[in-house]
Amino acid sequence: MKATFVLHGWWRTS
């Protein structure tokens, strides 16, 4: 699932 990765990735790195 790419959506979950992005959703939990952009705010993690921000």
Swiss-Prot record:
Gene Ontology biological process terms from the UniProt entry: L-tryptophan biosynthetic process
Keywords, alphabetical: Amino-acid biosynthesis, Aromatic amino acid biosynthesis, Leader peptide, Tryptophan biosynthesis
Taxonomy, superkingdom: Bacteria
Stored InterPro entries: Leader_Trp_op (IPR013205)
Functional summary from the UniProt entry: This protein is involved in control of the biosynthesis of tryptophan.
UniProt-recorded name of the protein: trp operon leader peptide
Species for this entry: Citrobacter freundii
